[in-house]
Amino acid sequence: MKKLLVSLCLALPFAGFAQNIKFTEYDLPNGLHVILHEDHSTPIVAVTVLYHVGSKNEQVGRTGMAHFFEHLLFEGSENIGRGEYAKYVENAGGALNANTTQDRTFYYDLVPSNQLELGLWLESERMLHAKVESVGIETQREVVKEEKRMRYDNQPYGQLFPEALSHAYKKHPYAWAPIGSMEDLNAAKDEDFVNFYKTFYVPNNAVLSIAGDINPEQAKQLIDRYFAGIPRGTKAIPRPTVVEPTNLGEVRDTIWGKDELPMILEAYHIPAQGTPEFYAVDMLNTLLSNGQSSRLNKHLVDEKELALFCGAFTFNLEDPGLTLAFGLANMGVDPKTLEDGMNAEFDQVKSELVSEQEFQKLRNQIESDFIQRNSSMAGIAESLANYHTYYGNANLINTEIERYMKVTREDLTAAAKKYYTPQNRVVLYFLNDPKLSSN
């Protein structure tokens, strides 16, 4: 039964997507924004809370705090014993998790619809009564250290993402990955964690988004019962205002490690999500890298056999993000040859208009991806919260696709010429160091 519920919530297509996704939204007096989407196609409900805090809200010397709290806030609360948080949801036949980005931290509980009250109680406990104390802090320090060792330090090409950020951002706090610095976490005192919690984990910095088999009026009553009494935060919520300079000249570096085959990474600065040019850039990256027939894969992997794999994706962020392009060189291929091949693909979208046939295929891919993002209750709840947080307009869940459809072939060429330039990029070579490999 448990596996069935989780599978339904995560994978079942949302039958009514062809119609608008209907929702209601309102604010509690304490500033908590609430979004409700009613859907009775399956007896499940996604109870989610998005806190508008990510690694960009951290200070130099105290990095990793946002991601650390993603772990710490499963430790328990004044009314939930240590290690008992997940058991409540699992015993009810549901699943729960959380994730942290540069811009937000997102918690979700996927439960049978008759357990809506349980999900609301658990999330209210996280917001009001979480245990931020030495025992949990020390426990999670070790958990996060092990995560860093597994995902970054001992993972092939594990430094790819952190190195891309630190080279691309010199002013903005996007310069570090959400995992942060273990030295910073070790240096943080208990009062640092308490202050972080009291600053960011407050109703006026959160969105409660619920999607699924609910009675909206009953849900509102339960929300009022569990959240209306939580005090509004009194601390000023810091938001970075620094703008990362762009087009300052190409940045090149070599990162030596134990990885056997050369990896090339290029990072191009792009506009913030939601701007007209962003949609053109995002479509370009889909053109270059989405699927086996995409340009990078077709030309550099299949035809020229320069790379074992090659791709690009949009690292879209609340503030201006990046296009990240990467290629793993085939055995015996000079990394400079692979870089030249990657650059040739970027140059082509600058010099040649995309054909009508390829453009129509691209539009179809964009539309399919948009539908897929909102094909589960959890996906709908997250999208509604994201659109409200980043744009102040949750209805973009229905209309953002129109912004993509307004992009023309000429817009693609113009965006490529503006953003895919050498002076606007970082180029990193990840090469094998025989001395490290032998140790």
PLM ranges: what are they?
Residues 4-5, 11, 17-33, 215-256, ...:
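Proteolytic maturation boundary segments
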Residues 37, 42-55, 64-66, 82-127, ...:
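M16 family metallopeptidases and their MPP-like homologs
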Residues 75-76, 127-135, 354-355:
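Short, polar/flexible loop-turn hinges at active-site or ligand-entry regions and domain interfaces
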Residues 149, 166, 235-293:
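His/Glu-based metal-binding/catalytic segments typifying zinc-dependent metallopeptidases
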